[in-house]
Design a protein with these regions (language model features):
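Hydrophobic, well-structured mid-protein blocks that either form specific transmembrane helices
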Residues: 76-115, 119
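Expand to "…catalyze enediolate/carbanion chemistry for C-C bond making/breaking, isomerization
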Residues: 122
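Conserved small/polar residues in nucleotide/adenosyl-binding loops
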Residues: 132-134
Length: 134
């Protein structure tokens, strides 16, 4: 099953904000123990890249991705650290194009028909619309 298929098959994708990378592996293991094998670690803190790397290296059964990716630099860093998918709060053509060209699953945030059409033009069939607060 490829990354997009695993994401589609997942009942839930937890969005995880970590202030300290030392908590990353324990969080991933707890999710795996609960039957969740996908997680999105956000770039809202300085610990994001190290957290992604720790999970990618220590938890091979966890599909780890990066969220709140807003720059190409963050995107490349996330992928270098082991992120298998990228989620962005907005549509950044540079980020999306780089992901598409490098075979990285990407879900940009889109709120207008123009953004959705731009995503489709780049070959995407999934976009993020809005946010859910639970």
């Amino acid at each position: 099953m490829n990354v997009s298929e695993r994401l589609a098959a997942s009942a839930v994708v937890p969005v995880v904000v970590l202030d300290d990378a030392k908590d990353a592996v324990a969080t991933a293991k707890a999710l795996l123990a609960g039957g969740v094998d996908v997680m999105e670690i956000t770039f809202r803190t300085a610990a994001a890249a190290d957290s992604i790397k720790a999970v990618a290296e220590s938890c091979p059964d966890m599909l780890v991705g990066a969220g709140t990716v807003i720059t190409l630099e963050q995107c490349k860093k996330a992928v270098d650290c082991g992120a298998k998918f990228i989620v962005s709060p907005g549509f950044d053509e540079e980020v999306v194009r780089w992901c598409v060209e490098n075979g990285i699953a990407v879900t940009p945030g889109c709120v207008t028909p123009t953004e959705i059409m731009a995503a489709m033009k780049l070959g995407l069939n999934v976009v993020k619309i809005g946010r859910a607060h639970v």
